[in-house]
A protein has these predicted regions:
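Solvent-exposed alpha-helices and their adjacent loops that cap or buttress functional pockets
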Residues: 1-2, 24, 34-38, 65, ...
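Ordered, amphipathic secondary-structure segments that act as subunit-interaction surfaces
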Residues: 57, 63-97, 108
Length: 159
């Protein structure tokens, strides 16, 4: 069984901190990130098995209430995403580089999963909203044809 990632964006930093705390106490999940982002929002990303992430997200949504801006669960996420989100990816060789910018931080994670599953590319980094005006971007490497295929898959799926 693969891992899942749960993403929650709030428009209150104190409520975001409370939600993150309750989410990790509610289920056996790893907290990948929980931090303020631009413009004045808070993003929480957890990973774990499908059931744990679902339980954790349900608690997060309850705590967030009307402060919730967006949420998403990606089941069976590509194995490279957690390290790319944490910014700790190690690769042996960087070939061609692909960069995709998204309108929101949460959609950058979804785009990364699509790209990594669509072509033989290695995720280098997924940056989520910090210092980006709420946007996100991902950087990956691979052969030219693979990078182009990954970019095309994201464009076709997400628009």
């Amino acid at each position: 069984m693969g891992i899942s990632i749960g993403l929650l964006e709030l428009k209150s930093i104190p409520v975001g901190i409370e939600a993150a705390d309750e989410m990790v106490k509610a289920a056996n999940v790893q907290l990948l990130t929980a931090s303020p982002t631009c413009p004045g929002k808070y993003i929480i990303i957890v990973s774990g098995n499908v059931g744990a992430v679902k339980s954790s997200m349900n608690v997060g949504l309850r705590v967030a209430g009307h402060y919730m801006v967006g949420h998403h669960i990606i089941n069976n996420v590509h194995e490279s995403l957690p390290s790319a989100i944490l910014g700790v990816t190690e690769v042996e060789k960087i070939a061609s580089i692909g960069v995709i910018e998204t309108i929101s931080g949460l959609s950058a994670v979804n785009a990364g999963d699509i790209a990594a599953k669509a072509a033989k590319v290695e995720m280098l980094e997924i940056r989520i909203a910090r210092g980006l005006g709420g946007k996100g971007f991902l950087v990956f490497t691979g052969e030219v044809s693979s990078v182009r295929s990954a970019v095309k898959a994201v464009a076709n799926t997400m628009g």
